[in-house]
């Protein structure tokens, strides 16, 4: 199995800048995360940007707000369940060497398998190289707030918050022969 899997790797980078005075505050941060999974071609990358600021305009009025933006992109997340790579690996008899299955296709159409092309179990290299997926999510959320002080003991405050996201999911499966399939979903 060690020849089938890769060594996973993750790295994270963050930087932030802030300033605080007696009448205002400001903070900006940026983060980046890059991950490579244990399956070949498996990746997950994320970028985050946060801005937060507030100010006391005078003794009666103050405002503050925050916005966070993020983008997450994943490629070839592992499939789970019956047709995922792990289930296919578990179905391999002990007398079959994984090296013998690396050439998973004879002519680009039919996949090579120890059980024959019509069985429910697929060559794990076929699953790895012919079933692909990717997803990308953009997200923005935050708030804007205002506070009005009428007296030392009476004030009015209001906040507006939002959360918006858009996700795009793509999946392809080569199938056997001309029976391939592909789908694209946009979710907002």
Segments from the language model and where they lie:
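Catalytic cores of large soluble enzymes that bind and process phosphate-bearing ligands
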Residues: 5, 9, 132-138, 142, ...
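Outer-membrane beta-barrel channels and translocator barrels
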Residues: 10, 21-22, 56-58, 149-151
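Short strand-turn segments of transmembrane beta-barrel domains in outer membranes
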Residues: 1-16, 29-39
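Transmembrane beta-strand segments of Gram-negative outer membrane beta-barrel proteins
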Residues: 21-30
């Amino acid at each position: 199995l060690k020849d089938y899997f890769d060594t996973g790797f993750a790295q994270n980078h963050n930087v932030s800048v802030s300033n605080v005075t007696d009448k205002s505050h400001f903070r900006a941060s940026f983060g980046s995360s890059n991950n490579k999974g244990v399956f070949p071609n498996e990746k997950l990358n994320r970028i985050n940007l946060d801005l937060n600021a507030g100010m006391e305009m005078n003794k009666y009025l103050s405002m503050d707000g925050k916005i966070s933006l993020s983008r997450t992109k994943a490629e070839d997340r592992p499939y789970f369940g019956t047709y995922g790579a792990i289930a296919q690996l578990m179905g391999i008899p002990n007398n079959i060497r994984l090296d013998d299955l690396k050439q998973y296709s004879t002519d680009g159409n039919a996949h090579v398998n120890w059980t024959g092309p019509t069985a429910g179990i697929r060559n794990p290299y076929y699953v790895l190289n012919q079933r692909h997926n990717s997803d990308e999510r953009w997200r923005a959320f935050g708030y804007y707030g205002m506070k009005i002080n009428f007296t030392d003991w009476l004030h009015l405050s209001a906040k507006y918050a939002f959360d918006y996201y858009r996700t795009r999911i793509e999946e392809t499966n080569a199938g056997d022969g001309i029976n391939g399939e592909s789908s694209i979903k946009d979710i907002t």
